[in-house]
């Protein structure tokens, strides 16, 4: 598990080089070394959050080298409301990965929870409706869909690594 540093709207360093606690910061080489990636971001106005965008924008060397081509990727997000931009956020996260030649793993409608959800979950990836205060727990359906997505990613990565 990795995270990305925060970015600032002012011209100054916003984060230490190494986090004091929690997941270590992702580095571009982490993408090169993995056989599959699950990439997540909170939704900001229907887009991925700026720190993830900044990180992905810094992967030009990997794009030029083609080092991420053929790797599977799955996506997940969380929004404040049901119509808060889950699908557009997941789509915005797909774009740089497709430019890298990565293979997007989504959720098929054979997942019953995807057909019946009144909360999070899309064919583009797993999602959670956190509520405007951010305090809504992950529903059972959201949890099952996230697990199904992780399982699909692992299965695809294993098959491609053979």
Please tell me what each predicted stretch does:
Residues 1-68, 121, 128-162:
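N-terminal beta1-alpha1-beta2 submodule of the flavodoxin-like/Rossmannoid cofactor-binding fold
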Residues 69-122:
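Short, glycine-/small-residue-rich phosphate/pyrophosphate-handling segment
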